[in-house]
């Protein structure tokens, strides 16, 4: 990338191009090809999908660059990769590999418990998770070009993604209704930068796209998130932890596109086989809740 391609306007525009699509987690070239053939608009290259990261425990880090390069060489669609929150070097390594987007992700073990990356220092666009408008606005102020709900990754349980999408959208409506002289107090109470809130008020929406992520496991889940206002869908473990990844991938892409066509979604949901095994959120210990990572 050149410095020109690294401007905020261009980076946000690149993320906007993925709007309405599905981004799938993959761990090798074979999975990347399945995702591309199913109609994914991009893939996320990593060593393990979130369900396996959750099961393995321990410290989870950036993927081996060999895996990232293997995926990049296998598909023509954009390739994303994850770095740990606050890990300056992992982000620079991924940028040097030529990935199309970097996800500063709570799925991996945070490297810094105080600071997120200053994403404006990079030419590559960044994706970040959020649960509310405070987190969303802080990530935007840091230079994030795309947001996604945090949900609860690797659970196959959509409830947290629904909660986060509804929360962000409700707070956007609240910001839009405030007078400008009321925004400063709102900024103080939420930790949201005032200038970003002004931009949200002026636009009536976030200035970057906001995808759904964290728990999407079925075509109906994907359609639900689109109806709640998501600009697109990330699917982590839901594809390749299902009984039939090829069928699930195609069905989720179709349901994301035609999210109000209930007869089609019913048809897409027939004969898919078992979805990934789900996890009840209330059974997770506080330290197992990935959505709590980041600030």
Swiss-Prot record:
Assigned EC number: 4.3.3.6
Ligand binding (D-ribose 5-phosphate): 25, 154, 215, 236-237
CDD domains (UniProt xref): pdxS
Catalytic residues (UniProt): 82
Any one Gene Ontology molecular-function term assigned to this protein's record: pyridoxal 5'-phosphate synthase (glutamine hydrolysing) activity
Keywords (A to Z) from UniProt: Lyase, Pyridoxal phosphate, Schiff base
Pathway the protein contributes to: Cofactor biosynthesis; pyridoxal 5'-phosphate biosynthesis
Cited SUPFAM superfamilies: Ribulose-phoshate binding barrel
Protein name (Swiss-Prot/TrEMBL): Pyridoxal 5'-phosphate synthase subunit PdxS
Species the sequence originates in: Bacillus cereus (strain ATCC 14579 / DSM 31 / CCUG 7414 / JCM 2152 / NBRC 15305 / NCIMB 9373 / NCTC 2599 / NRRL B-3711)
Upper taxonomic lineage: Bacteria, Bacillati, Bacillota, Bacilli, Bacillales
């Amino acid at each position: 990338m050149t410095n020109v391609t690294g401007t905020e306007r261009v980076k946000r525009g690149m993320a906007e191009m993925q709007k309405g699509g599905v981004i799938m987690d993959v761990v090798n070239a074979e999975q990347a090809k399945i995702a591309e053939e199913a109609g994914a608009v991009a893939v996320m290259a990593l060593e393990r999908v979130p369900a396996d990261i959750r099961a393995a425990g321990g410290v989870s880090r950036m993927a081996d660059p060999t895996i990232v390069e293997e995926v990049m060489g296998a598909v023509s669609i954009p390739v994303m990769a994850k770095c740990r929150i606050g890990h300056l070097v992992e982000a620079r390594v991924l940028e040097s590999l030529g990935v199309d987007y970097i996800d500063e992700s709570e799925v991996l073990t945070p490297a810094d418990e105080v600071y997120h990356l200053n994403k404006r220092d990079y030419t590559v666009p960044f994706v970040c998770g959020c649960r509310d408008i405070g987190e969303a606005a802080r990530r935007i102020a840091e230079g994030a070009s795309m947001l996604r709900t945090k949900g609860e990754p690797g659970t196959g349980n959509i409830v947290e993604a629904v909660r986060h999408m509804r929360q962000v959208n409700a707070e956007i409506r609240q910001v839009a209704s405030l007078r400008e002289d009321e925004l400063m107090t709102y900024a103080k109470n939420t930790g949201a930068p005032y200038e970003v809130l002004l931009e949200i008020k002026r636009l009536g929406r976030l200035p970057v796209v906001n995808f759904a992520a964290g728990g999407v496991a079925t075509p109906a889940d994907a359609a639900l998130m689109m109806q709640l206002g998501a600009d697109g869908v990330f699917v982590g473990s839901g594809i390749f932890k299902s009984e039939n990844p090829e069928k699930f991938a195609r069905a989720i892409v179709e349901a994301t596109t035609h999210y109000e066509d209930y007869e089609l979604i019913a048809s897409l949901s027939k004969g898919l086989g078992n979805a990934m095994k789900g996890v009840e959120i209330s059974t997770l210990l506080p330290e197992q809740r990935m959505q709590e990572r980041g600030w």
